[in-house]
Amino acid sequence: MDPTPSVPAPQLFSLAGQTALITGATRGIGAACAIALAEAGANICLVRRPGSTNDETANAIAALGRTVKIVDADLADVDAVKGIFGKALEAMGGEIHILVNCAGIQRRSPAVQFPESDWDDVINVNLKSVWLLAQAAGQHMVPRRRGKIINFCSLLTFQGGFTVPAYAAAKGALGQLTKALSNEWSKENVQVNGIAPGYIATDMNEKLLQDPVRLRQISERIPAGRWGEPRDFAGPVVFLASAASQYVCGEVLVVDGGWMGR
């Protein structure tokens, strides 16, 4: 592994001249992360669901003067996922320095009634697509001895949750996958880490936000006194994408307002 650069601390966080590929970036946490990486100097390739006309993230990145490209792909379609990295490389001039796997879906149902189709969809999007993209990134980054891979995990990487067996299984496995890849690739100067969001005010948590009882129960347990917002991930993602985290390997950074400390 290369040593941390001997430059002034602010420069450690610069992503100038780098390119990032990010999934799940048309809204919520993913959009905030994509914009933050662009603010730090990176050019961005977004993975977007086919048929989506949401250009808000792309427009925000372009307004910063960065190059932004879009690859349309359904992350539940394994064959489509296998083609993403190659398309991104072509779009970004043959170099990807940073991969952020942020896309995720949720399906809720009691375990005894949980549909097999929902299980397959959640596992494919939340775990298999991450594995395939990380593998493709590793094939590109390891020979070049440079790269950062950031996998979005969850509180359910550590806890079991309720009525979300597929999501818990996928996120638990993702934490271990992050460590497994880090064990192999850290010596090749490719750092693999994760971020585990706490309770964040996004569309995925809309049902919880609309349930007065659960909203109160959750809110009372968060030491920070509030739910997280997408912008709370700007600093963590830039840190893990930059030279500032050069010696951080195989970690899952929990961004939860103190939830896991209770």
Where are these regions (language model features)?
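Conserved glycine-rich cofactor-binding loop
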Residues: 19, 26-27
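Active-site helix of classical SDR
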Residues: 134, 170, 178
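Alpha-helical segment proximal to the catalytic Tyr-Lys
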Residues: 139, 183-187, 246
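Short C-terminal tail/terminal secondary-structure segment
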Residues: 2-11, 159, 237-238, 249-262
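Conserved glycine-rich Rossmann-like NAD(P)H-binding loop of the short-chain dehydrogenase/reductase
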Residues: 40-56
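Residue(s) in the substrate-gating loop at a strand-loop-helix junction
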Residues: 154
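Substrate-binding pocket helix/loop in short-chain dehydrogenase/reductase
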Residues: 81, 110-111, 115-123, 149, ...
